Regions:
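Conserved catalytic or regulatory cores that recognize and/or transform ribose-phosphate-containing ligands
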Residues: 1-151
């Protein structure tokens, strides 16, 4: 099963971003899933103090490259996992990813605490399932893949 991982990036430190994506990707791979990550081929950003939504010139991080690659990865996934917890700011990228996933008929699993700014009718209607905790969402994905996560 292929799964696209979406989570707010802008405003977070590179350590926060890479730590999250590395951990989630590892757990999903242990269940035999193939994770698609917006951080693919961006390891050179590990030293960034704060992640920005624009202004990068590296070929894999131009606005066009990010938009097209993330859209391609999402369109080739079976499940889209959107974690809206711990965001530093509203994520326009995540909202695009959620909209693309809905338009493409993907199975959408969202994690949100249900508070503003993500307590919104569009998110609630686009999501197939909304969890309030990351652990509960991962447990569901584990059951969907018929396996147990190994820490």
């Amino acid at each position: 099963m292929k799964i696209y991982i979406a989570s707010p990036i802008s405003g977070l430190t590179s350590e926060e971003v890479f730590s999250y994506y590395d951990d989630i990707e590892r757990k999903l791979r242990l269940c035999g899933m193939k994770p698609y990550s917006p951080m693919t081929a961006k390891h050179y950003l590990r030293g960034e103090m704060t992640m920005n939504p624009h202004g990068y010139t590296h070929p894999t991080s131009t606005g066009h490259a990010i938009y097209k690659r993330d859209k391609w990865m999402l369109s080739n996934s079976d499940v889209v996992f959107v974690n809206l917890l711990n965001s530093a700011t509203i994520s326009i990228g995540c909202m695009f990813e959620l909209a693309w996933a809905d338009m493409l008929g993907k199975h959408i699993v969202v994690v949100s605490n249900g508070e503003p700014p993500y307590n919104h009718a569009f998110i609630k209607q686009a999501a197939d399932i909304i969890f309030t905790s990351l652990d509960d969402a991962l447990e569901y994905l584990q059951e969907l893949a018929h396996c147990d996560f190994v820490s």
